[in-house]
């Protein structure tokens, strides 16, 4: 993989690096998890204007026993990585150090998505256990600055920024460049505010894609394409576990037109304690995606769907 989109974002092409998964699906017609996303708390210390989960309950946090159950269960099913994310701001979770330590002890590679304000809540030992950290630099829209500690050389640091109504276009690159010079992130991902319609999103992708290309490395623009999937299988491969004790099919359901800018109940897949049943060996069914009109995982769903529905011509590549 040579380009930053392929390396540092969720793409269907990464499935090619999991031949054991592909072989298992071909032999059993059952999907098993590769990675999980865990949002342990809804608590946050920012109120970003573009937050796609802004209408959430603001005081929800998973019990640490529930987190351990999730990590144990998906580990037994073969999951290899966990992304700790929001929700809210994950470093505000009361058991964030214990969660990372437990996941590491189970053999997970652990990534952390944070607004960068809570590094002081992470122990030095915990930080050493992280594979990567991605900081949402939109914190600079609301704070004068953040303190990023010296991180282990083996840890991949990345920045992300959402272009939004509060963005000061004449200032943001200057500010980001200052942090890039000091902390040398592997990448700076730029995305648009996805709380919009398809036509506006296409315009944003075109305009911002051209702009960020001019900015050069380490910047890259990640276009988000909205689709309505025929079938949703991605839920089995990379499920999203939320602070309300439910599992959702993915992180993008908050973008759907009926989501009310939160993880709406209509998009719940199952309760946490029902996870084992979803992989129990019974015939799996896709998540009902009739209300998913802003899916950004269409490529992933298409690839997994082709494994679930072989047509007999797979050898003719």
Indicate where each model-derived feature is located.
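Radical SAM enzyme [4Fe-4S]-AdoMet core and its adjacent flexible, acidic
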Residues: 1, 7-10, 39, 60-65, ...
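Conserved alpha-helical substructure of the radical SAM core
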Residues: 2-125, 129-132, 142-145, 302-308, ...
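Sequence-level motif detector for i,i+2 pairs with an aromatic at +2
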Residues: 31-33, 154, 290-292
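Generic structural signal for small/hydrophobic residues in well-ordered secondary structure
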Residues: 40, 44-45, 89, 159, ...
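Short cysteine clusters
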Residues: 44, 48-51, 232-235, 250, ...
């Amino acid at each position: 993989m040579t380009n930053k989109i392929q390396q540092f974002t969720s793409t269907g092409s990464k499935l090619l690096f999991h031949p054991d998964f592909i072989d298992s699906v071909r032999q059993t017609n059952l999907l098993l998890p590769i990675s999980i996303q865990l949002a342990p708390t809804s608590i946050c210390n920012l109120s970003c204007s573009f937050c796609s989960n802004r209408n959430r309950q603001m005081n929800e946090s998973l019990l640490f026993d529930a987190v351990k159950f999730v990590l144990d269960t998906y580990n037994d099913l073969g999951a290899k990585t966990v992304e700790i994310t929001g929700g809210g701001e994950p470093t505000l979770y009361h058991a964030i150090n214990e969660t990372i330590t437990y996941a590491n002890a189970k053999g997970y590679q652990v990534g952390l998505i944070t607004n960068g304000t809570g590094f002081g809540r992470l122990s030095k030992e915990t930080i050493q256990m992280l594979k990567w950290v991605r900081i949402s630099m939109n914190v600079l829209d609301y704070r004068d600055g953040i303190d990023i500690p010296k991180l282990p050389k083996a840890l991949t640091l990345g920045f992300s920024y959402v272009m939004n109504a509060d963005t000061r276009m004449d200032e943001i690159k200057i500010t980001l460049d200052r942090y890039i010079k000091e902390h040398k992130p592997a990448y700076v991902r730029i995305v648009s505010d996805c709380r919009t319609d398809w036509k506006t999103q296409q315009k944003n992708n075109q305009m911002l894609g051209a702009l960020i290309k001019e900015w050069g490395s380490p910047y890259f623009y990640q276009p988000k394409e909205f689709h309505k999937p025929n079938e949703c299988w991605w839920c089995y491969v990379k499920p999203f576990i939320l602070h309300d004790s439910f599992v959702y099919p993915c992180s993008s359901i908050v973008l759907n037109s009926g989501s009310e800018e939160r993880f709406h109940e209509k998009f719940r897949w199952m309760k946490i304690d029902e996870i084992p049943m979803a992989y129990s060996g019974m015939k799996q069914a896709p998540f009902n995606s009739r209300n998913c009109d802003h899916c950004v995982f269409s490529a992933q769903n298409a690839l997994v769907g082709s494994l679930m529905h072989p047509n007999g011509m797979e050898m003719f590549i």
